[in-house]
A protein has these predicted regions:
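Signature of exported/secreted
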Residues: 1-169
């Protein structure tokens, strides 16, 4: 049995700030992100460890194109409970059913908000595909900010000179 949120072993609060600027030929983009995070360590039976990341605040300045989708889908990332894999990265999402229920709640609102977008059906099918499989959801979050900074998997041990590393690139 897992201990309740109030019985977490430890928790820390972070503010994630990110400034993105891209320019590719004539295309230019700027985006500023602010996210408030609370990361808790939960201890269960047999001293199994799970981490809970709560992100109650997520603000971004750019709401054009795909950035609008990121803001609309933030509710799905408000509370994520996961354990780490053998590489120290996000391994298993333990509250995937809760995330799927949230998606069912907001799906119609997202569909209506993006009704004039050409690729809306393809994006919604992609979201449903990722949410239907724990491995795909964990893989999607594993290299997404700010989760990459919380559990990068490369800082937990030393690597030998020629040892291959499975990381972001």
């Amino acid at each position: 049995m897992w201990k309740e949120k109030k019985e977490a072993r430890s928790s820390r609060k972070f503010i994630f700030l990110r400034e993105e600027r891209y320019q590719l030929q004539g295309l230019r983009n700027e985006n500023y992100i602010e996210a408030h995070l609370k990361v808790s360590c939960l201890i269960g039976e047999s001293d199994q460890v799970r981490y809970m990341v709560e992100m109650p605040v997520y603000k971004q300045t750019n709401e054009d194109g795909m950035y609008k989708w990121v803001g609309d889908l933030h509710e799905l990332r408000e509370r994520i409970v996961f354990s780490l894999n053998e590489n120290g990265q996000i391994g298993v999402i333990h509250n995937i059913s809760e995330i799927q229920l949230k998606w069912d709640e907001i799906k119609s609102k997202v569909f209506l908000r993006h009704k004039n977008e050409k690729y809306r059906n393809m994006l919604i099918k992609g979201i449903e595909k990722v949410l239907s499989n724990n491995d795909q959801l964990a893989g999607a979050l594993r290299f997404a900010m700010p989760y990459l900074l919380l559990s990068p998997g490369i800082h937990s041990r030393e690597y030998k000179k020629n040892e291959p590393v499975s990381g972001y690139r």
